Amino acid sequence: MSGRGKGGKGLGKGGAKRHRKILRDNIQGITKPAIRRLARRGGVKRISGLIYEDVRAVLKSFLESVIRDAVTYTEHAKRKTVTSLDVVYALKRQGRTLYGFGG
C-alpha cells in the first residue's frame, strides 16, 4: 500500500484531494414554513412562534443519533458510502422501524 496516498486502491498519480467546506448553522436551513408543513401533516392547526427553535434543536439531536448509528454500520462494513439499509438498521436499533427501503 506504499505510495498510494489516502485512497489505497487504484493506480495512477491520483487527483486533487477533495476538501469539504465546513458547514455551520445549517439547522437554519429547516425553515419556518417547512416546520409548519410538517406540523400540518401531523394534524396541528395553530403553531406558537416560540416552537421553531425548539423543533430545530430536537430534529438536530434526532438526526445526529441516527446518522451516528448509520455511519457506524457503514464503517463496520468497511464502506465509505452510507446506504439506505444503514439508515433503516440505525432507525430499527432506536426502535423506529421503517418499512419500504429493504431490510
Curated annotation (Swiss-Prot):
Report the SUPFAM superfamilies cross-referenced here.
Histone-fold
Q: What does this protein do?
A: Core component of nucleosome. Nucleosomes wrap and compact DNA into chromatin, limiting DNA accessibility to the cellular machineries which require DNA as a template. Histones thereby play a central role in transcription regulation, DNA repair, DNA replication and chromosomal stability. DNA accessibility is regulated via a complex set of post-translational modifications of histones, also called histone code, and nucleosome remodeling.
Question: InterPro entries attached here?
Answer: CENP-T/H4_C, Histone-fold, Histone_H4, Histone_H4_CS
Q: Give the record's subunit note.
A: The nucleosome is a histone octamer containing two molecules each of H2A, H2B, H3 and H4 assembled in one H3-H4 heterotetramer and two H2A-H2B heterodimers. The octamer wraps approximately 147 bp of DNA.
Which stretches are labeled DNA-binding? Answer: 17-21
Q: Name one GO molecular function term.
A: protein heterodimerization activity
Against Gene3D superfamilies, the record matches this protein to:
Histone, subunit A
Q: Where is the composition biased (Gly residues)?
A: 1-14
The text of the family note is:
Belongs to the histone H4 family.
Question: Organism, per UniProt?
Answer: Eremothecium gossypii (strain ATCC 10895 / CBS 109.51 / FGSC 9923 / NRRL Y-1056)
Its protein name is Histone H4.1
Q: Where is this region: Disordered?
A: 1-20
Q: Which residues carry this modification: N6-methyllysine?
A: 6, 9, 13
One GO CC term on file:
nucleus
| Gene (name only) | HHF1
- Cited Pfam families: CENP-T_C
Which SMART domains does the record match to this protein? H4
